[in-house]
Amino acid sequence: MKVLALSALLSLASAASISRRSDFCGQWDTATAGDFILYNDLWGEDNASSGSQCTGVDSASGNEIAWHTSWSWEGGSSDVKSYANAALQFTGTQLSSISSIPSTWKWTYSGSDIVADVAYDMFLGSTADASSDEYEIMVWLAALGGAGPISSTGSTIATPTINGVTWDLYTGPNGDTTVYSFVAQSTTEDFSGDLNDFFTYLVDNEGVSDSLYLTTLEAGTEPFTGSDAELKVSEYSVSIE
């Protein structure tokens, strides 16, 4: 899920190689690292009866980052508690102007009784800023412990194969935003592909207009419940071309 924040100019230092830092644990704590802002983003923590989460940078350089997040959450089993994520900093770009969005993502998850997703979260709107988002596009590399996406019916609307992976596609509303969720049929811990292929599919098959702007591109995890959990991202990269 996206939380709007004031954008900040990246300093020259942020483009340099960055090594491991201390973890941050506050609800809205962030760290700028390379081309990314890393968010702890405990937006749903009030849905938990107890729990906490901390996130940290392991290394970063340009459009590549390694990072981790550790958490334990109890209660509110049907509610997402957070979305720790690495958000690419870029100017909103019209889909028709994008030729490719190459991305790699290698990760592992450990812990007990984990219910969570590991997912890209992207937004499309009629303007280049994030004030007019109409669509949320999620690409779930994993649905752990029975986690499920937003869906009007609970049923898939298609099962496309994109970037060599077969996905269950769901759709449903989140307020005024239409959500499309591509959920990998098998957990994919080592992903390499072109995220633009998902937008091309939606333009060709679901009536999404290529005049819309990509305004947000994030990658992280949405936990529901679990204990002593850690998502470790050993390699993540993305760029818009």
UniProtKB/Swiss-Prot annotation:
- The stretch of residues making up the signal peptide is 1-15
GO biological process annotations for this chain's record?
cell wall organization; polysaccharide catabolic process
| MF terms (GO), sorted A to Z | cellulase activity; xyloglucan-specific endo-beta-1,4-glucanase activity
Give a GO cellular-component term: extracellular region
Matches recorded under Pfam families: Glyco_hydro_12
Subcellular location as annotated: Secreted
The record ties this protein, via Gene3D superfamilies, to: 2.60.120.180
Q: What is its EC number?
A: 3.2.1.151
The reaction(s) annotated as catalysed by this protein in its Swiss-Prot or TrEMBL entry are: xyloglucan + H2O = xyloglucan oligosaccharides
Chain segments annotated as transmembrane: none
Q: Which UniProt keywords apply?
A: Carbohydrate metabolism, Cell wall biogenesis/degradation, Glycoprotein, Glycosidase, Hydrolase, Polysaccharide degradation, Secreted, Signal
Residues carrying sugar: 47
The record's annotation in InterPro entries points to: ConA-like_dom_sf, GH11/12, GH12
Which family, according to the similarity comment? Belongs to the glycosyl hydrolase 12 (cellulase H) family.
Described function: Catalyzes endohydrolysis of 1,4-beta-D-glucosidic linkages in xyloglucan with retention of the beta-configuration of the glycosyl residues. Specific for xyloglucan and does not hydrolyze other cell wall components.
Checking PANTHER family in the record gives:
BLR1656 PROTEIN (PTHR34002), XYLOGLUCAN-SPECIFIC ENDO-BETA-1,4-GLUCANASE A (PTHR34002:SF9)
Q: What is this protein called?
A: Probable xyloglucan-specific endo-beta-1,4-glucanase A
Please report the organism this UniProt entry assigns to the protein. Answer: Aspergillus niger (strain ATCC MYA-4892 / CBS 513.88 / FGSC A1513)
Starting at the broadest rank, the lineage of the source organism is: Eukaryota, Fungi, Dikarya, Ascomycota, Pezizomycotina
